């Protein structure tokens, strides 16, 4: 166990004793803290790289757009923590770098975003085996995913480049994670 795991265990044990948590609740609290710690670590790595490459704001805009839609639309996850790092760097560092260094035609980005809105309308919310969505929430999540995506798209029509393109990129990335091709392997297990 590393230093952070020990601290998480100590804090989870403290919470268990203080709040009379049973063993299952203790495990849930500990898992939640472990996931939070890993995600914070990934964000620190990703945003540090973005800062070094002088694209911090663009990475932030892309990532926030992605997150605002994803909290309602859900979507595919990387199979491991390592692949999550790799995918995050590709999607939120390399793709914004491509947009910064190679002017992507405004019309192409609009077309890709409109296609992405269609994908979100059809496939959101996309549950996974590890993160199922309760049936009672599906309609509401679909509605919010569409509303948030459309609102962000309308904002891109009002604001100037390059910021509009990074919002569009976030919409496109989230739409890709909803495609059924990412769930075939999971369904076969």
UniProtKB/Swiss-Prot annotation:
The protein's name: Accessory gene regulator protein B
Role played: Essential for the production of a quorum sensing system signal molecule, the autoinducing peptide (AIP). This quorum sensing system is responsible for the regulation of the expression of virulence factor genes. Involved in the proteolytic processing of AgrD, the precursor of AIP.
Membrane-protein topology: Multi-pass membrane protein
Localization (cell): Cell membrane
HAMAP family noted in UniProt: AgrB
Keyword field: Cell membrane, Hydrolase, Membrane, Protease, Quorum sensing, Transmembrane, Transmembrane helix, Virulence
Pfam families per record: AgrB (PF04647)
GO molecular function (one): peptidase activity
Main enzyme class: hydrolase
Transmembrane segments: 49-69, 81-100, 110-130, 143-163, 164-184
Source species of the chain: Staphylococcus aureus (strain NCTC 8325 / PS 47)
InterPro entries: AgrB
Assigned protein family: Belongs to the AgrB family.
Keyword hit for Transmembrane: yes
GO biological process, one term: proteolysis
Enzyme Commission number, as recorded: 3.4.-.-
């Amino acid at each position: 166990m590393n230093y952070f795991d020990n601290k998480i265990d100590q804090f989870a044990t403290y919470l268990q004793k203080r709040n009379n948590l049973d063993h299952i609740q203790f495990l849930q609290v500990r898992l939640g803290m472990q996931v939070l710690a890993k995600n914070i670590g990934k964000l620190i790595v990703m945003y540090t790289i973005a800062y070094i490459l002088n694209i911090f704001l663009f990475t932030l805009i892309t990532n926030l757009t992605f997150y605002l839609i994803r909290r309602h639309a859900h979507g595919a996850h990387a199979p491991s923590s390592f692949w999550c790092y790799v995918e995050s760097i590709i999607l939120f560092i390399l793709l914004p770098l491509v947009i910064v260094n190679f002017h992507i035609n405004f019309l192409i980005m609009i077309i890709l975003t409109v296609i992405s809105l269609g994908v979100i309308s059809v496939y959101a919310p996309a549950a996974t085996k590890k993160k199922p969505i309760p049936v009672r929430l599906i309609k509401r999540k679909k509605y919010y995913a569409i509303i948030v995506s459309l609102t962000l798209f309308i904002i891109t029509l009002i604001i100037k480049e390059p910021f509009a393109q990074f919002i569009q990129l976030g919409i496109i990335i989230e739409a890709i994670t909803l495609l059924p091709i990412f769930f075939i392997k999971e369904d076969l297990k």
